[in-house]
């Protein structure tokens, strides 16, 4: 669930702000201050994250109803909570990465393409061997290696990147052209 939910988040988050430029609403929205635009994108980011996280919840809940999968002493509810937390970090990481790449390249196709290439690299055996437990997808090995919690390092790195990026480099969330004039009253 973790890798595929993050792949889905690449598609859901790709036009989070760039949609305003494509639909020619950018000049109207540009009249607002940069902080208002960043707040708008953060709200959209949260709603998109929540939607993909709910899809992961439904998917994993259906899986647990079909397969009674007690691993060791961990019950299904604990597995569900751990999986949703881990998947939520991956969704936020790849969503943020996609938004930033689309804004840097100013092209949705190129931004999504680079994000998908990074997803393939991290989700491959090469990525697992290079980054080991620092890989954001190291959680996939959690249930196969007798509840090894070394995957938390990769999730913490992903969460720190997203939180640091959304607070310190918050202007990376929007594509801000300077040629449109603002009219303040």
Report the location of each language-model feature:
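Terminal transmembrane helical anchor/hairpin motif
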Residues: 1, 109-185
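Secretory targeting signals
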Residues: 1-16, 41-108, 146
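A helix-boundary/kink motif common to multi-pass secondary transporters
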Residues: 22, 36, 106-107
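N-terminal hydrophobic signal/anchor transmembrane helix of membrane proteins
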Residues: 25-27, 45-60, 157-168
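Secondary-structure boundary/capping residues
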Residues: 26, 38, 109-110
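Broad structural signal for hydrophobic residues in well-ordered alpha-helices, predominantly aliphatic
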Residues: 28-29, 101
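Short helix-to-coil transition segments within interhelical loops
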Residues: 29-37
């Amino acid at each position: 669930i973790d890798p595929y939910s993050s792949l889905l988040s690449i598609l859901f988050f790709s036009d989070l702000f760039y949609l305003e430029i494509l639909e020619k609403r950018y000049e109207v929205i540009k009249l607002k201050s940069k902080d208002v635009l960043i707040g708008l994108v953060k709200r959209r980011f949260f709603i998109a994250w929540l939607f993909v996280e709910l899809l992961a919840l439904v998917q994993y809940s259906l899986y647990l109803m079909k397969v009674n999968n007690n691993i060791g002493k961990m019950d299904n509810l604990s597995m569900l909570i751990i999986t949703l937390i881990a998947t939520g970090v991956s969704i936020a990481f790849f969503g943020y990465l996609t938004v930033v790449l689309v804004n840097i390249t100013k092209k949705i196709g190129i931004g999504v393409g680079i994000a998908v290439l990074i997803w393939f690299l991290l989700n491959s055996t090469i990525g697992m061997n290079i980054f080991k437990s620092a890989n954001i997808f190291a959680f996939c090995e959690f249930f196969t290696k007798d509840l090894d919690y070394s995957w938390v390092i990769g999730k913490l790195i992903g969460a720190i990147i997203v939180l640091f990026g959304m607070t310190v480099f918050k202007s990376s969330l929007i594509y801000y052209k300077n040629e449109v004039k603002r009219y303040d009253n």
